[in-house]
Amino acid sequence: DGNYDWENDDITTKNFPISPEMIGKKVEVKTKLFHFNRDISSEDAISKMDKDGYRPATLMELLVLGFLFPELQRQFPIIALGSVWCDADDYRYVPCLSVYDSGRKLNLDWLVDVWDAHYRFLAVRK
């Protein structure tokens, strides 16, 4: 449990299924927070991660980051582009760690065309 002050109700195992082979398994991964210091599209962010030998993190990997480093999201919002959920209206969302008032928030952000420069993107070494 990440002890978030607020969690989006749409973050469920139904919307973000866990592959059966991963349940109960401990996997070590090398992660990196990408910050581009400029507005960037999801496509460009993923391309730059790929060029550096990384892939976008999933919701599960983002949750581990939030558990291990609970104060990090107070500095900047952190996006996991590796997990996308599409709602009934065909809007696409990605998991995000951020703050709400002074509390830690686990939310879904719209998968936008361009992300503001203050966002960070969690990635995992391939």
Positions of PLM-derived features:
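A binding-site-centric feature that preferentially detects glycan-recognition modules on secreted/surface proteins
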Residues: D1-R55, M60-K126
